[in-house]
């Protein structure tokens, strides 16, 4: 969920595409994860590879941290630590420095704090069961939400004449009440 950019004119699309190619953009995400990270701010620097390239994976698109993968860096800041139904959760602000497929999801799972509702990187059997049976009460108990609690909260383009930014608040449907 969150901010997505769509242009109506070819020239605008060209300018935004060039800015993205030149890495003159910044995307900030908000997410709800399991557990409480030990640090309030930290950087995850771990290369990513499609899991099926090095071992069997029933989910073709699943990525993993692997020494032979592409460089991937994610900056993270804890916004809030939450106690809910006897469990610990954290609300994070996450900024990918690189832009690898599933980067945020893989990195957070890798450090032991998977995104709430993530069917692939929390427990991949959830995804396989979801494909077979759809959304069930058992999946709801395990995942809490029918989708991952990852939200594109802000998108900024840095142009010579100034920055352009768009923001979207975290969805109410993905919040936990304390």
What do the PLM-derived regions correspond to, one by one?
Residues 1-178:
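RNA pseudouridine synthases
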């Amino acid at each position: 969920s969150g901010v997505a950019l769509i242009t109506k004119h070819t020239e605008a699309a060209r300018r935004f595409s060039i800015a993205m190619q030149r890495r003159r953009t910044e995307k900030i995400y908000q997410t709800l994860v399991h557990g409480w990270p030990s640090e309030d701010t930290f950087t995850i620097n771990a290369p990513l590879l499609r899991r099926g390239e090095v071992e069997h994976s029933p989910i073709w698109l699943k990525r993993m941290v692997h020494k032979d993968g592409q460089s991937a860096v994610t900056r993270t800041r804890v916004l809030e630590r939450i106690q809910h139904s006897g469990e610990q959760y954290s609300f994070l602000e996450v900024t990918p420095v690189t832009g690898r497929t599933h980067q945020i999801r893989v990195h957070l799972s890798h450090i032991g704090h998977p995104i709430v509702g993530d069917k692939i990187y929390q427990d991949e059997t959830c995804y396989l069961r979801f494909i077979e049976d759809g959304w069930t009460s058992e999946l709801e108990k395990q995942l809490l939400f029918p989708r991952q609690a990852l939200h594109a909260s802000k998108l900024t383009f840095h142009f010579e004449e100034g920055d352009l930014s768009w923001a979207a608040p975290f969805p109410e449907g993905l919040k936990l009440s304390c």
